[in-house]
A protein has these predicted regions:
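Cofactor-binding loop segments of dinucleotide-utilizing enzymes, especially the Rossmann-like FAD-
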Residues: 8
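Glycine-rich beta-strand-centered segment in the early N-terminal region that forms part
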Residues: 21-37, 50-101, 109-110
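Short, acidic/hydrophobic/Gly-rich beta-strand patch recurrent on exposed beta strands
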Residues: 18, 45-48
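General nucleic-acid-binding
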Residues: 106
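Short beta-strand-initiation
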Residues: 15-17, 111
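Short structural boundary motif marking the start of a folded domain
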Residues: 1-4
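Short N-terminal binding/cap micro-motifs at the start of the first secondary-structure element
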Residues: 11-15, 41-43
């Protein structure tokens, strides 16, 4: 698969296109073939290691938003089927409406 990734240096100017092996889904996981992505301010901050130790380690893919379709699924993954259109979310508790304290702590993922 092709990916845009920070390899050895921080900063958006160091993001490079790389070829990576296709990911294998784990138990209860799906693999998404991303078809559209958006680079937002959070991604730029992350690419500059602007979140300090919470920025993760290199190499990483600085991406929070996108959409695609399910292209593979692991054992026990039953909520989505291959071919389903999906849009991964950054906060797993905030699915609709205005955010409130119930959504606190729901941030999921970060650097890929």
């Amino acid at each position: 698969m092709k990916a845009m990734r920070l390899e050895e240096e921080w900063g958006p100017e160091h993001i490079k296109e790389v070829e990576l092996p296709d990911p294998e889904p784990g138990i209860g996981e799906i693999v998404i073939s991303m078809k559209a992505t958006a680079i937002n301010p959070r991604d730029l901050i992350l690419s500059r290691k602007g979140y300090g130790r919470h920025s993760g380690n290199l190499p990483l893919i600085p991406l929070a938003d996108g959409a695609g379709h399910v292209c593979d699924q692991g054992a026990g993954a039953t909520k989505f089927q291959i071919g389903d259109l999906v849009c991964p979310i950054y906060n797993r508790y905030w699915l609709t409406g205005t955010s409130d304290s119930a959504h606190s702590g729901g941030s999921h993922g970060g650097p890929l």
